[in-house]
Amino acid sequence: MSQTLMHSRFSSGFLHHQPEKGFLTLQTQRRHAKTLKGEKEFPSRVVSCHKNVDSSKNFSSSCEKSKTQEKILAQTLGATSDGEAIVQPNNDFEVTWQNTLRRKWDAFSIFSRPYSAICTIIGISSVSLLPLTSVADFSPAYFVGLLQALIPFLCANIYTSAINQLVDVDIDKINKPYLPLVSGEFSMGEGRAIVSALTFTCFAMAIMSHSVPLFVGVLVYFLIGTAYSVEHPLLRWKTKPAMAAFSMAGLMGLTIQPTVFYHIQNVLGKPMVFSRSVAFATMFFSIFAACLGAIKDIPDVEGDREFGNLTFSVRYGQEKVFSFCLNVLLLAYGSAVVVGASSSSLLCKTVSVIGHTVLASLLVLRAKSTNPKDPESTQSFYMFLFKLLYAEYVLIHFMR
């Protein structure tokens, strides 16, 4: 009997290859398997599973697989008559730097929360287009200015996610056991090194840009992201519902929209004018982000309650918070329809009214199929909201 080992983020421990014993059953929750062949050890990975294995038949695990599951070299799997799981290595198995690098990159992709990083990239790219008035504005100076904004804000965004994970390791053992610092893919030392590198890079790039709006934006973003997570009597804003909502609004709305807009105006030598479109974007994304922050905490009630984090969901209940956020988002879309309808341009009026009506309808339909008490359902709804954000970054160009 033999099976292929697969990676799982939910288990830990060591298994040993003992070829002198027979195969009967497998019951293990271990993660890092080590096989012995002579005096050498062969690191491998094994999925966490409670299954009986028939030694005469093949089986396939029905255990949950990580979305970032790695493709690794095949091993054979079985168990001894004592219930001890064992592994037989393939002769050609060996650890390579490519495998290690791939594993670390996969861990970093989870560590950086790609959906948030993508939102930052799309948002900055979109807002940077608002000051442009003609094709001639697509100059080398514009693209340099865009990169000057993208790199430090992206580093600051990943820093915010990383510092939160460094501080919340114990809570994440309950709420998010797949995160690299919890699963062991990253050590605490590696996490701190990444945070330090991101901090240096974001400020170095902001300073070298010689752009006051950009530096102020990056500094405020960094300070809010730090205050949101770090332990301090006056900080740790994520445990204070009102400050947590302000933090999300500040990060995604009040900071990026105006500072990137003014930065590009400065790069292009245009007068500092706060346009109708950037004013709408700042207000809309601030409201949307505050609701995102509250919805983000809905699946984490168990861990937050155990560690005394009095989020809105812990205080008022998941269903009430979900319903309130949904109504606020619908109000924001309704306001967007009104603002769009007041445009003097027929094209802008038509696109903004129809576009926001469609997005609001999609929001309602998705909300009806979401169960606030089901963490997976709520997390899926949370990710859906980011798709609505991506669409909004297109519509803001018609709010003129």
Swiss-Prot record:
GO terms for molecular function: prenyltransferase activity. Its EC number is 2.5.1.139. It is a multi-pass membrane protein. Its main location: plastid. Keywords: Chloroplast, Membrane, Plastid, Transferase, Transit peptide, Transmembrane, Transmembrane helix. It holds the Pfam family UbiA. GO terms for biological process: cellular response to UV-B. Induction: Up-regulated upon UV-B irradiation. Residues 1-48 form a transit peptide. Optimum pH is 8.2. Expressed in roots, leaves and stems. Inhibited by psoralen, a major downstream product. InterPro entries: AtHST-like, UbiA_prenyltransferase, UbiA_sf. The chain crosses the membrane at residues 116-136, 143-163, 204-224, 242-262, 278-298, 321-341, 345-365, 379-399. It catalyses: umbelliferone + dimethylallyl diphosphate = demethylsuberosin + diphosphate. It is found in: Plastid, Chloroplast membrane. One of its GO terms (cellular component) is chloroplast membrane. Prenylates umbelliferone in the presence of dimethylallyl diphosphate (DMAPP) at the 6 position to yield demethylsuberosin (DMS) as the main product, together with a minor amount of osthenol corresponding to 8-prenylated umbelliferone. No activity with other coumarin derivatives such as psoralen, bergapten and xanthotoxin, or with geranyl diphosphate or farnesyl diphosphate as prenyl donors. Belongs to the UbiA prenyltransferase family. This is Umbelliferone 6-dimethylallyltransferase, chloroplastic. It comes from Petroselinum crispum (Parsley). The gene is PcPT.
